[in-house]
Amino acid sequence: MRAREFTALKRLGLAALLAPVATLAAPPAPSPGHAFELYAQVIVHGDAAAQAELGRYLGTAKGPAIAAALASVSHLEQAPEMADWPQAAAALRRRQASVRCSVGSVHHPQADTADVDYRCHLPDLTALLPVYRQHPVPFNGPHPPQMASELASAYTQMIATAPDRERIITVSFERDHDGGAWRVQNPSPLMGELADAFLPFFEWNEHPPGEDR
């Protein structure tokens, strides 16, 4: 996923949307901790209620669009690897709904910046590797990346039962000097870890597990 993060941000228009803009009159703001939780709910789950609350919290004309763009990255079942495999896509979505991702520690390098450590319990698909080595997903060919039927079948079974592994994911936020809403500076760390956990194929091709990097 790492090599695809910039492309994903550009495709979603997040880079432009996340630029600071003039704030509007806003309703009473939630606590910073709750605001950081909203971001996780939107990015990880695409939660509609959290998306609406985040859009209001941001307090700008772009707020709803930012929240919608962040929510769109949660739809991993729409990745090219899932095309033609609706059972695998449905299994992915069911497992994703059970993901727990909460705010851990928060560090403030400066008064108006925050580095938030999210504690996320994401599936560990290492047990899928033997099947993947026999049926790898090509990412550099003339066609969109697709799973072979053998891999899709194994994935559908394993994504439902794979053990969780806790990951600590740091995301940076900032706000205006006069206070206001916390804005995510770059959602790529959380987006990338989420995608790599559920769709590890690109990362496995780039950095085969067990090999020194």
Q: Can you describe what each PLM-predicted range is?
A:
Residues 2-13:
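Bacterial N-terminal signal peptides that target proteins for export
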Residues 20-22, 26:
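N-terminal signal peptide c-region/cleavage motif recognized by signal peptidases
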Residues 26-95:
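Core segments of small alpha/beta cavity-forming domains
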Residues 74-146, 210-213:
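Surface-exposed, charged secondary-structure patches
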Residues 133-213:
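Low-complexity, intrinsically disordered terminal/linker segments enriched in charged
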